[in-house]
């Protein structure tokens, strides 16, 4: 069972539809016990970083997500949800994030239209489980005005938008997509299927303990 975190700022409906399409069992929840009982977690998000962190704090979900992230349970952040995984953001004000990944969220300063919205090529950097069946140079769908300034060793996919935008990051059990896999057609569905596979592998490992 995958828990989709509902904190009032997520693209919940589209993520739900995507998981339903790939046949993944899921629950939409903000209940701490349900999240801890899940086999994997998706943190979606659309909107402002500081407001999102305030809401997560109010719901006592900061602690929950940090515990999930520091365990071996698979966690996938999408768009703003990915950005929240980092140490802090410069959006509106300096604001601390979940600190599960090293790096800072900075505003895009490019000679192009902001937000970066639409399809862009994703170049793979290294191999991870979520790349199974995903071709290098596939196109994915973005909507964002901020990007992750983070160490190269956690970057597994990049797109060019005047700067090199980390499109996909990963460290251990933690994954983050700056783009929207649930809106990225067959390629996005393949990535979510791969995440489902990672979740199932983790679940099986727990049953054998």
Swiss-Prot record:
Keyword Iron-sulfur: no
Highest taxon above the source species: Bacteria
Signal peptide as annotated in the record: none
Gene Ontology MF annotations: glutaminase activity; imidazoleglycerol-phosphate synthase activity; lyase activity
Disulfide bonds: none
Location(s) in or outside the cell: Cytoplasm
EC number: 4.3.2.10, 3.5.1.2
Keyword Iron on entry: no
Protein name (database record): Imidazole glycerol phosphate synthase subunit HisH
Organism: Bacillus cereus (strain AH820)
């Amino acid at each position: 069972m995958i828990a989709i975190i509902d904190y009032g700022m997520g693209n919940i409906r589209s993520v739900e539809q995507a998981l339903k399409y790939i046949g993944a069992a899921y629950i939409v929840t903000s209940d701490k016990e349900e999240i801890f009982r899940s086999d994997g977690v998706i943190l979606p998000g659309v909107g402002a970083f500081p407001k999102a962190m305030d809401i997560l704090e109010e719901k006592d979900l900061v602690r929950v997500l940090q515990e999930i992230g520091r365990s071996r349970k698979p966690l996938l952040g999408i768009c703003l949800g990915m950005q929240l995984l980092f140490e802090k953001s410069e959006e509106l004000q300096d604001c601390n994030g979940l600190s599960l990944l090293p790096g800072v969220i900075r505003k895009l300063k490019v000679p192009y239209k902001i937000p970066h919205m639409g399809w862009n090529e994703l170049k793979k950097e290294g191999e991870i489980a979520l790349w199974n069946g995903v071709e290098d140079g596939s196109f994915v769908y973005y909507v964002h005005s901020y990007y992750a300034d983070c160490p190269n060793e956690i970057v597994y996919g990049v797109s060019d938008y005047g700067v090199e935008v980390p499109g996909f990051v990963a460290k251990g059990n933690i994954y983050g997509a700056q783009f929207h896999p649930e809106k990225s057609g067959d390629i996005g569905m393949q990535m979510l299927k791969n995440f489902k596979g990672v979740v199932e592998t983790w679940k099986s490992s727990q049953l054998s303990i």
